[in-house]
């Protein structure tokens, strides 16, 4: 019992020290953080090889038509993006509203604003592409309705709390995936926008649907589509685009205005078609180090 308590205290101590260091890093100028990111790329890619096998396999399977030279070029570009992404995420702890607005621009938000004028709550989705964290943080600075972002909590409580504080600094509300239906019910009379990262991997025994995505049979979550059909809320996609280091633009694209008129899996298929087109156009900015295809369809009869 005492040894378990001691281990817990040591873990919390290391976590607290880590968070203190991250908060310190966050206060540094953005230009200096990008300098550190450029340095971090070399040990991460060439020495540590962080998830390099996963990234390489994902790229090879996703782009069978590309040569190994082309694959490696995308791979290196991804790791450069990933190191910037890590430090941009840390910057969320201190970034000002004005700087975030300057760095993340939303286009054609009139699509959202029209639904708001009509008194309609909205469902929105995006993928783990570019800097989705900055995108969600910047969303709370627009004229969009109250945003509820669905997320998976981190196992470490201290780091989960740190992330939560960063993500909600400007008014967004983050709710754990398991609480989605409860919060939907409790806010049904309010004007809201629920946001989903629709490219997460489902738990093996919960897989219900596979679709073709990046040349592979891919298990996907159906939560967004199920909620859309239950609530008949319009569904939009936030398409993020990298402009230059630290600068992004987000385009809004309608998936459907009336889910009741869609066919089975149409909403899910359309959201993944949009993401696939984005990745094919500029592949380096998706989260390739995630084990997206860890499940085999033979494991599941769905």
Place the predicted regions along the sequence by residue.
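Catalytic core of membrane glycerolipid acyltransferases/transacylases, capturing the structured
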Residues: 118-178, 203-209, 216
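Short glycine-/small-residue-rich flexible loop motifs, especially phosphate/cofactor-binding loops
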Residues: 56-57, 136, 164, 208, ...
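Non-catalytic C-terminal accessory region of glycerolipid acyltransferases
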Residues: 9, 73-76, 114-116, 141-142, ...
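Short, composition-biased local secondary-structure segments
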Residues: 24-28, 131-136, 186-199
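Membrane-anchoring hydrophobic helices of lipid-metabolizing enzymes
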Residues: 2-126, 160-161, 165-166, 171
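Hydrophobic (often cysteine-bearing) scaffold residues that line and stabilize catalytic clefts
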Residues: 71, 155, 159, 267
């Amino acid at each position: 019992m005492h040894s378990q308590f001691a281990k817990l205290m040591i873990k919390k101590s290391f976590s607290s020290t880590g968070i203190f260091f991250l908060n310190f890093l966050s206060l540094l100028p953005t230009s200096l953080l990008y300098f550190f990111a450029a340095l971090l790329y070399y040990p991460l890619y060439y020495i540590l090889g962080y998830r390099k096998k996963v990234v390489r396999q994902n790229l090879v399977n996703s782009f069978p038509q590309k040569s190994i030279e082309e694959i490696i070029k995308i791979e290196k570009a991804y790791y450069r993006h990933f190191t910037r992404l890590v430090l941009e995420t840390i910057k969320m702890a201190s970034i000002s509203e004005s700087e975030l607005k300057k760095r993340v621009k939303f286009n054609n938000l009139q699509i959202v604003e029209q639904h708001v004028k009509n008194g309609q709550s909205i469902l929105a989705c995006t993928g783990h592409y570019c800097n989705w964290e900055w995108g969600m943080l910047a969303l709370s600075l627009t004229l969009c309705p109250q945003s509820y972002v669905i997320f998976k909590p981190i196992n470490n409580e201290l780091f989960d709390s740190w992330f939560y504080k960063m993500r909600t600094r400007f008014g967004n509300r983050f709710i754990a995936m398991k609480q989605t239906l409860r919060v939907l019910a409790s806010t049904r009379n309010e004007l809201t926008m629920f946001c989903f990262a629709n490219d997460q991997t489902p738990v093996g025994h919960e897989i219900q649907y596979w679709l073709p995505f990046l040349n592979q049979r891919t298990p996907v979550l159906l939560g967004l589509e199920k909620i859309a059909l239950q609530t008949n809320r319009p569904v939009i996609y936030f398409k993020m685009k990298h402009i230059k280091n630290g600068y992004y633009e987000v385009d809004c694209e309608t998936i459907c205005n009336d889910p009741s008129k869609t066919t089975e899996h149409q909403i899910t298929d359309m959201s993944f078609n949009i993401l696939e087109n984005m990745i094919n156009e500029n592949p380096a900015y998706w989260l390739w180090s995630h084990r997206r295809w860890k499940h085999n369809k033979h494991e599941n009869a769905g």
